[in-house]
Amino acid sequence: GLGDVYKRQSGRTLPGIMHSRIDSSDPVNVPGEICVKGQNVMKGYYKNPEATQAVLDPDGWLHTGDMGTRTPDGTLFIKGRYKTMILTATGQNIYPEEIEAKLNNMQYVAESLVVERGRSLVALVYPDYEVVDRDGITTEQLPAVMEAIRKELNKKVAPYERIDKIQLRPTEFEKTPKRSIKRFLYN
């Protein structure tokens, strides 16, 4: 519903303080990299010109690595990270973070990661074992429960974003100090 749209909204950049642009031929409909520029944007990495050159272009635009769209009134919507985007054989861009957000809000899912395996989308899922146990779901029943969750999820995503398989994990995903999943370990 409409509430889902606003949950992904990032807001507008501040006039006179920061400017933003989307590197896209059609920034309203086609996601592109979000770039920002302004007094409050860094001028570079300390004593690291190579890293600076990788993210700051000659005109001073910081390439954030975030992919998004922007409405005509300037409201930004972040779709996901450029590095995590999955490009399908038919040319569709899949932002796994969007699918993961939906999956993580479903019953019995503690955390998830969507990855490409061959030409299939697989959701790696660490179940909420506390809730699973509380509800009396056995280890033998859990795959069938997750299959029902997969089918429900697939009703909420675009056809090209549908998950082909859920793979259960017995342990939590390895995380960075910021508590982000170390995605690179699971690709």
Sequence positions of predicted segments:
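Short, small-residue-biased leader/transition segments that mark boundaries at the very start
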Residues: 1-6
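Conserved ATP-binding/catalytic segment of the ANL
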Residues: 12-18, 26-29, 33-88, 105
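Generic structural signal for well-ordered beta-strand positions
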Residues: 30, 71, 77, 94, ...
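Adenylate-forming
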Residues: 41, 75-102, 131-141, 159-164
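C-terminal boundary motif of the adenylate-forming
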Residues: 67, 72, 105-129
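Residue-level signal for inorganic ion chemistry
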Residues: 74, 103, 123, 166, ...
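Conserved C-terminal "lid"/linker of ANL adenylate-forming enzymes
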Residues: 111, 119, 150-187
